[in-house]
């Protein structure tokens, strides 16, 4: 796992960008984006909320390949709950499996649960280390 500071969107189109997500849906069945990278992604790609909503409705709150070099990484059950270290650990394993089966070579992940979620990086980092090899860059937004 590589760690660096920077703007995750400077890698758009070059790497798979991972969006931290939750399992909440609107009445219309669209995913509820949190703040940060996921909100920015929905602003750039409005189709994300509908597609992710369909996937959550069909398969639950899991890691998904959204296409267009975007993937999801659940960190909490709902948009109103706190990030859960157990969900983050499960998502790390699922993302590694998806990266392996998809042949992804460069994956950018924001620090899960550490921005608006309030978790400390020193508590989250050990959950990612067993799963994230040198294809994974965890980026701390500047």
Q: Where are the predicted features?
A:
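Macrodomain-like recognition of ADP-ribose-binding/processing modules
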Residues: 1-142
């Amino acid at each position: 796992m590589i760690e660096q500071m920077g703007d995750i969107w400077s890698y758009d189109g070059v790497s798979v960008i991972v969006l931290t997500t939750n399992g909440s849906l609107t009445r219309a069945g669209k995913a509820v984006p949190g703040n940060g990278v996921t909100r920015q992604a929905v602003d750039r790609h409005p189709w994300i909320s509908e597609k992710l909503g369909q996937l959550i409705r069909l398969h639950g709150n899991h890691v998904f390949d959204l296409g267009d070099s975007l993937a999801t990484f659940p960190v909490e059950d709902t948009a109103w709950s706190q990030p859960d270290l157990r969900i983050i650990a499960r998502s790390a394993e699922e993302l590694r499996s998806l990266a392996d089966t998809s042949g992804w070579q460069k994956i950018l992940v924001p620090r899960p649960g550490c921005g608006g979620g309030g978790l400390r990086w020193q508590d989250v980092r050990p959950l990612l280390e067993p799963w994230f090899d040198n294809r994974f860059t965890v980026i701390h937004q500047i």
